Amino acid sequence: MNSAFPSAAAQIPAAIDTVRRFFDGLNHESDTGDEAPVIATFTTKCNLCGSGVYSIKTLLDGKHTLRGGHVHLLSINSAIATYNNVVSINVTESQDAAQQVDSTGRVVQTFPSSPPRHVIFELETDESPPKIWQLTRADE
C-alpha cells in the first residue's frame, strides 16, 4: 500500500461503501420518510449531511410524498487517505427532477433535475464502518 497513512488507506473500501449507503439512505428517506439509514452514515459534525436529511423531512411534512428526486452516485473519481484517520472521496453525483405531492395527489412543488456535479466526502476511519464528517460541493 503506497500511502503516508496506511491505517486510513486500509479503510478506503469501507469508506466508499459508507458513501454508497449515504446515497441509498437519502433515496430511502425520500421514498419512505425513514431517515435512520442515512443518519447512520454520518457524524453530527456533517452539517451539509444533516441539512439534506432535514430538507427531505420538511418536504414530507403534512403527509406529502415525493415523486422522483433520487440522487445518483455516477462515479468515484478518487479515494485517498489524507490523515491518519481520514479518507477523502471525490465523487460525481446527479439528482432526478422531483415533484412534491399532497395527500390528494396534487402536485404542490416541482424541482428540476441537477446536472452532474462533484462532491467531496471526508470520512473518519476511527469507527467501523467509517462515518462522513464533512461534505463539500466542489462545484459551488
Could you say what each language-model-derived stretch is?
Residues 1-67:
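Core segments of small alpha/beta cavity-forming domains
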Residues 2, 27, 47, 77, ...:
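Detector for Asparagine
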Residues 15, 19, 76-78, 121-124:
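Generic alpha-helical hydrophobic packing signal
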Residues 37, 45, 74-75, 117:
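Generic secondary-structure boundary signal with a strong preference for alpha-helix termini
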Residues 43, 58, 76-78, 108-110:
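Short, well-ordered helical secondary-structure segments
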Residues 61-79:
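A short, amphipathic edge element
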Residues 80-140:
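Exposed beta-sheet edge and beta->alpha loop/turn motif
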